[in-house]
Amino acid sequence: MTAPTAEALVTLQDLEAAADGLRGIAVRTPLLPVDALTERFPAGVWVKPEMLQRTGAFKFRGAYTFLRGMSAADRARGVIAPSSGNHGQAVAYAARMYGVA
């Protein structure tokens, strides 16, 4: 395995831009405490129910962000997601939001 290059590392600025682009688009899913597990472990245990997200999975966030970052010309060429699972559903849903086939 090779070490990532500086260009490949995700920055705080990248994360903030992605969050800004998803505001009003992605469902803001809650953080829920799991009291039964918190009682057993020395730290609080929380879950984020991403099944409440569009397409039922967190993968929508990445798919939408990726399409948002594409140029209109590239989006017009279409997208392919070699998956029939959560990733494929998320890409298809995000593509439909952009009018992409």
Language-model region placement:
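PLP-dependent amino-acid enzyme catalytic core
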Residues: 1-101
